[in-house]
A protein has these predicted regions:
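Short, structured surface patches at the beginning of a domain
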Residues: 1-112
């Protein structure tokens, strides 16, 4: 299973390094080539973000995608729901570190 990290910040003066470090501390090993970093507003729909689209194109069934917070996927609840559903339908294991049930692809996670 390949593990990817999607790290997003909204403004140029912020860094994604804290997200990369949080994922490492949580025990996930992500190769540098699988860390997708993007500086773009969370209000921008996920599939309108160039780096996120490239990430989705790379993902295959059985891959794992880690985000530190659900808002890294977006700020609009409907868009986040669509994005989560799309990833799960692709067979991607989706991990969100700040949720009580971290694995959104699990039976419990799908209830969140």
């Amino acid at each position: 299973m390949r593990t990817f990290l999607y790290a997003r910040v909204s403004v140029d003066d912020l860094t994604t390094q804290n997200q990369v470090e949080a994922v490492k501390r949580a025990g996930y090993e992500v190769k540098p080539s699988r860390v997708i970093e993007e500086t773009i507003s969370g209000a921008t729909p996920a599939m309108d973000r160039p780096q996120f689209v490239k990430l989705v194109d790379k993902l295959e069934e059985g891959d794992c995608l880690v985000v530190t917070k659900i808002d890294r996927l977006g700020r609009d609840n409907i868009d986040v729901q669509k994005t989560v559903t799309m990833l799960l339908d692709m067979g991607v294991k989706l991990i969100c570190l700040d949720l009580p049930v971290k694995d959104l692809s699990s039976a419990e996670g799908k209830l969140i």
